[in-house]
């Protein structure tokens, strides 16, 4: 019973704050991913990918970057997806458009990938808000193929991974800062011949060179 009461109080407080304390949402200025560099050190994106209008509408992203960055070795490839959402509030007046960020763990099974390892790990790549954060680390499988995935939510000066933190900070920032903008950053590398350590080293090397470039594209 106490959990039900707490849940009802949370819903009531949520409604009050959203309705009366945060009516005019702040949309921060940022640089479009159209100008994002396609060469970072020895990594090159030669095949930027485009979403169909239907997929983009379903994701609710305002802007995105999706590309395979390749190194000098043909086996060196990092798939990058960043979806930026300038707001995660459904517009008043209805409509079916969903603006909130979709957690990757909800989408992977639908694309045929099974999550066989899942952890939350600390990250300290240069360029992260505050210099540190957390990421979810997945190993995913489809048949004999294996991939290593890092993803985190880089939003309003934080890099966080846990879904309950995402919900909590979105609620607080909407109330206190009138902002709900945020981004999902996802990096994926193939695991060749079960060499998980090699995939990890490749992803870390890429991220250390890639993450500092996000300044200006993801508002803090």
Protein language model features and the residues they cover:
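ATP/Mg2+-dependent ligation/transfer catalytic cores
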Residues: 3, 14, 36-37, 185
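Hydrophobic membrane-insertion alpha-helices, especially the h-region
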Residues: 2-18
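Alpha-helical transmembrane signal-anchor/signal-peptide segments
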Residues: 22-40
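Short extracytoplasmic
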Residues: 35-67
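A short linear-motif detector with a strong N-terminal bias
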Residues: 21-25, 44-49, 57-60, 116-117, ...
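Residues embedded in well-ordered secondary-structure elements
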Residues: 32, 56-58, 127, 174
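Active-site-proximal structural scaffolding
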Residues: 6-10, 36, 178, 203
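A cross-kingdom signal targeting lumenal/periplasmic-facing segments of multi-pass membrane
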Residues: 65-206, 213, 217-218
């Amino acid at each position: 019973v106490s959990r039900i009461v707490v849940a009802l109080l949370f819903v009531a407080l949520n409604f009050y704050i959203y309705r009366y304390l945060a009516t005019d949402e702040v949309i921060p200025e940022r640089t479009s991913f159209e100008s994002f560099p396609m060469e970072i050190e020895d990594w090159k994106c030669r095949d930027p990918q485009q979403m169909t209008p239907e997929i983009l509408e379903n994701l609710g992203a305002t802007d995105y970057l999706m590309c395979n960055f390749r190194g000098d070795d043909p086996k060196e490839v990092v798939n990058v997806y960043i979806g930026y959402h300038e707001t995660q509030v459904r517009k008043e007046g209805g409509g079916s458009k969903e603006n909130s960020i979709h957690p990757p763990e909800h989408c992977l099974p639908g694309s045929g990938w099974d999550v066989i390892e899942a952890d939350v790990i600390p990250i300290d790549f240069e360029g992260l808000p505050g210099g540190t954060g957390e990421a979810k680390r997945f190993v995913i499988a489809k048949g004999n193929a294996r991939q290593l995935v890092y993803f985190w939510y880089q939003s309003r000066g934080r890099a966080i991974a846990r879904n309950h933190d995402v919900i909590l900070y979105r609620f607080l920032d909407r109330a206190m800062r009138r902002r709900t903008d945020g981004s999902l950053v996802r990096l994926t590398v193939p695991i060749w011949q079960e060499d998980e350590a090699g995939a990890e080293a490749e992803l870390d090397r890429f991220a250390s060179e890639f993450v500092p470039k996000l300044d200006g594209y993801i508002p803090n």
